[in-house]
């Protein structure tokens, strides 16, 4: 059971995607509070590129964010963000973020948020769940920054719980949880950058290609393939290497998964 939360911003966003006129459209976007999206872009004609806008003031203890997205059969959506999500120091209350992404058969989701930055003293709990069907396609990443290493600031105190799940036809393929408390970072080898990338469905050939792309991260990166779910995990102390490797892996996997060449979201180039 979750602990009681101090009253803060209650923000919800529910997105519904459908096929219409030969392309994926955002059929519905219902939101409460300062959590919304920009108008969809179509740099690839039928594929919908959507920018999710987190609150500009960041996320503090007591805030609750709930994000859900449903993709109807045949949809292809790429969701990213203009900037990092920032979790600020808390006086004790917990910030809670729930993200639930549901894909119908033949739907494709590219979930590519910017990094989440946890300031020293933050108290945050995150749940991200992907519900797929056997014929859904998923390419997603999750990048956490502990402290602000670019200015020499570490996650010296605070609490972070990050839970990540992938379900296919109501069966769990991945259930993992990262739990960090009071500056104890031995479980992440004292590295400030923690990344996970997911690809479904994948093959042994894709696994081999991804492992080659992970070479710049040395011993602090690995990839595995279980029940067609390719999972990439890495740790680093260099955000530029992290971001470059993540994008390199995405660019390698995307044509195999979707049959489309990589098209960088315009916001990444600004």
Curated annotation (Swiss-Prot):
The entry's localization annotation reads: Cytoplasm
> Annotated Gene Ontology MF terms?
nickel cation binding
Domain of life where this protein originates: Bacteria
The protein's UniProt keywords, in alphabetical order, are: Chaperone, Cytoplasm, Nickel insertion
Please provide an example of a Pfam family that matches this protein in its UniProt record: UreD
Q: Entry's InterPro entries?
A: UreD
> Which HAMAP family does this entry report, sorted A to Z?
UreD
Q: What does this protein do?
A: Required for maturation of urease via the functional incorporation of the urease nickel metallocenter.
SUBUNIT field: UreD, UreF and UreG form a complex that acts as a GTP-hydrolysis-dependent molecular chaperone, activating the urease apoprotein by helping to assemble the nickel containing metallocenter of UreC. The UreE protein probably delivers the nickel.
* Family label: Belongs to the UreD family.
Q: What is this protein called?
A: Urease accessory protein UreD
Q: Which gene encodes it?
A: ureD
């Amino acid at each position: 059971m979750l602990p009681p939360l101090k009253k803060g911003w209650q923000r919800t966003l529910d997105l519904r995607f459908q096929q219409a006129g030969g392309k994926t459209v955002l059929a519905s976007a219902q939101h409460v509070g300062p959590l919304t999206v920009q108008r969809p872009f179509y740099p690839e004609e039928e594929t919908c590129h959507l920018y999710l806008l987190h609150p500009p003031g960041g996320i503090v203890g007591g805030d609750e964010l709930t994000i859900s997205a449903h993709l109807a059969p045949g949809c292809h959506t790429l969701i990213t963000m203009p900037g990092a999500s920032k979790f600020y120091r808390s006086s004790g209350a917990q910030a809670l973020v729930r993200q639930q992404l549901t894909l119908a058969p033949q739907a494709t989701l590219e979930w590519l948020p910017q990094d989440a930055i946890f300031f020293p003293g933050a108290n945050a709990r995150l749940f991200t769940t992907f519900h797929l069907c056997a014929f859904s396609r998923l390419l997603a990443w999750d990048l956490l920054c502990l402290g602000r290493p670019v200015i020499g600031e570490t996650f010296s105190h605070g609490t972070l719980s990050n839970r990540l799940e992938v379900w296919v036809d109501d069966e769990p393929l991945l259930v993992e949880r990262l739990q960090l408390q009071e500056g104890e970072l031995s479980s992440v080898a004292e590295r400030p950058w923690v990344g996970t990338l997911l690809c479904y469905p994948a093959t042994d050939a894709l696994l081999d290609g991804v492992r080659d792309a992970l070479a710049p991260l040395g011993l602090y990166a690995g990839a595995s393939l279980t029940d067609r779910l390719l999972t990439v995990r890495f740790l680093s102390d260099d955000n530029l290497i992290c971001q470059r490797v993540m994008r390199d892996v995405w660019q390698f996997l995307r044509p195999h998964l979707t049959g489309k060449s990589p098209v960088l979201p315009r916001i990444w180039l600004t």
